[in-house]
């Protein structure tokens, strides 16, 4: 069927900020979809609130709106643009929920707008637990016994009838939010109460638990002519009971017989046809390991995390084809872009194994609840491809960047057997490493299977890895053992450890025997047809399919998995860098390990290597491709950390040189550089042990800011008030980086701002200064940032520009650089310099219109700012006000304190832009879901050092009609100053303590600060977590509360008696 001519203008709804459960896979899907629709000649209008994505670049759609994804704003854009149709299935759960809201509000009917892709009835049938159950019964598809409840009592009655354990699944939530497995009535009450609150329709499904079954996923496509196919089937390493986003996953399925595979395939196709989905869909099934019994778990009627994985695993571009199906094209008339000859109707076949391992944030959140269940906790994921399961698993392990090069954590060799068994049974994010340790200690795989319900096939593969380790121990320097270890994915580093040698010795031994990896092509058809894609993975076999090009090439290193501190912003910079390399006439090669992102879409670069970002894997690609040089500036800390080793191996690092990167990262060299350049910084010292640190703090004076050198996202950074706290910090935190010392700095409590600059070594372009709303002490990634600055005098801005210029030239910076400043008493100090692209690059590029990563790349390749038509110095400011606001995922992470501090905690960001600061702030707060009512009750619980400042805020809240409530000490202080506040009880006073008031909906906002000492106050944490659970706006920095107040005041009319 040809594409539709009756629609011209299509609106695509994006997925908003990155949160746990909805990450960069939707940037990838949305980008693909917009480009596909433009390719077919439609006019595309995009709405998304996330500035950090490629998707919100001007060239991706005909018109791009970076506005809050709320009914109020989307409605206004629709009325302004009048699209003929809306495509909501590429914006994750956010897009689907927005489509439902637009429909319920009557907006779609009113303006005669059609929904493309999946009809509302199908979304409803798949998402509404009751309708889904009815449909499955009609289709004769088995689902676990279940009931729909709207109250906790109904849940308890049902569970008493069928027995525990049961699973709670709230309707219309994302990433299993609010759900869980309950083994007792007490757990059931707690989880159901929370789940009903989080479900927008106050509805939960309570079902018999089938934990322990195999979890299988089918990624299916269907078009309007009822053609349907399976793109990819995947099998979870972990059995049912752990969210698929938190499971290790293999593609294709590994343990199913042909009969089982056909049975589940038929079920998946039957379901997508019954739902009449046009586009992509993901079906999750549970299979009994001991019989042919299976259950349908759930259906996602949209492009999902699994479809991004399936696209990258097979090379089949699901989102692109789904967008074309939505406008009427059929699978049998679209060419598969990988082969260029076969049609999209042809099911992909794989002659390799793909492994996906999730990346968790627990290196940042040491106190977080690490046990896995039906609620997702991972921030990102890595994928690796190999010719056997062991190879793909080990490549994925070393892609994680958690300090391991193998499925082994050396620290586990010291734990007791008892702890080992507990960790094997109760799955945490690192269970794979505990399982491998158990096998090394001689536990049989049969024992482990009965404890974990993980299939023997997978455990046998872990055993095989251990057997190869033992073989290597017995045969040191043995060539055949080395070849075998390499064939099964062992890294040089691991083999060197076993043989007690240096990694370079193993590399030399390999080279002397010409033992190099070959690169195989991902071609969707198991080499049955010629493929045209330059998409490769390494393996140790005979035939190499990647041919070095005759054109000069440049290798760009990506940023690996998404984690807190290193998000999609770095992928944005990578993709832009590639565009600039191609424009300059070179071949652009990307190397990355993240399946969710745009950079690993094979159509972005001239060649894509899907490989771990380790020295060995990068060198192997360099040995084959012989690029002119490597760019490390855009891959975050991941790429920067490889620069030294690559440079020592004789690789040309383009842009800022390694010794200059070192001058910015190494404390003593940096201090020396600042002194020479005449730039002030907070007084500080380096310490390698406890005595030195105490000596430094004594000399500088408390409070001090302590942190390890060479880290990203403020990991293990703390503000310390006294000697005791400092000793405790050193004893617990220095393990963050043993070979690097810790830095002890004077802590300056002033205004923070940051600058991204682009330098060619002689001139420096400063696109803009971003002023932070929160004062120093809150990590820059967690602060709200304003551009252009609202409270910095012209003189201070000139000083900042001057210091930035001196730094860029003094550090021989070529390309990007980020500098953070703190201002106190009109004095500007430099806090830190990062000689690379930072997380603010996409935001600043969008608000200034300067394609920063592209310009930086051109400078790295030898052009000057003058050649490109840019002046030296600070770029003229924008007329609008733009706010970048952080977005957190605390609802997904139990036991993580939401108090903001020097360690980064946000997972994503949104942007608000308008003609005034107040309007821009309003949009930013709406976009990050901090909606505050015009009046109500606000609770203040304030540390002594901020009470005076909090008092003026409380007075302003009262003036606009809020009732002030406060805890004992704060209320007493307010009363002394003439402001009366309602007293709230201490934690534990059942009737009116803050958590109780919050639970009953009596509180509209909470302002809670702690002293500089930031002791882990249990009460404060309970208050904060109750606010997070109930979705009550919580301010842990007075500056954020002040910003919110500015918005409320601007929306209030003045009411005075005459």
UniProtKB/Swiss-Prot annotation:
Its cofactor is Mg(2+); Mn(2+). Pathway: Amino-acid biosynthesis; L-arginine biosynthesis; carbamoyl phosphate from bicarbonate: step 1/1; Pyrimidine metabolism; UMP biosynthesis via de novo pathway; (S)-dihydroorotate from bicarbonate: step 1/3. Mg(2+) 3 binds at residues 820, 832. Residues 930-1058 are annotated as: Allosteric domain. One of its GO terms (biological process) is 'de novo' UMP biosynthetic process. It holds the Pfam family CPSase_L_D2. Mg(2+) 1 binds at residues 284, 298. Keywords: Amino-acid biosynthesis, Arginine biosynthesis, ATP-binding, Ligase, Magnesium, Manganese, Metal-binding, Nucleotide-binding, Pyrimidine biosynthesis, Repeat. Mn(2+) 3 binds at residues 820, 832. NCBIfam families: CPSaseII_lrg, PRK05294.1, PRK12815.1. Composed of two chains; the small (or glutamine) chain promotes the hydrolysis of glutamine to ammonia, which is used by the large (or ammonia) chain to synthesize carbamoyl phosphate. Tetramer of heterodimers (alpha,beta)4. Belongs to the CarB family. This is Carbamoyl phosphate synthase large chain. It comes from Streptococcus pyogenes serotype M3 (strain ATCC BAA-595 / MGAS315).
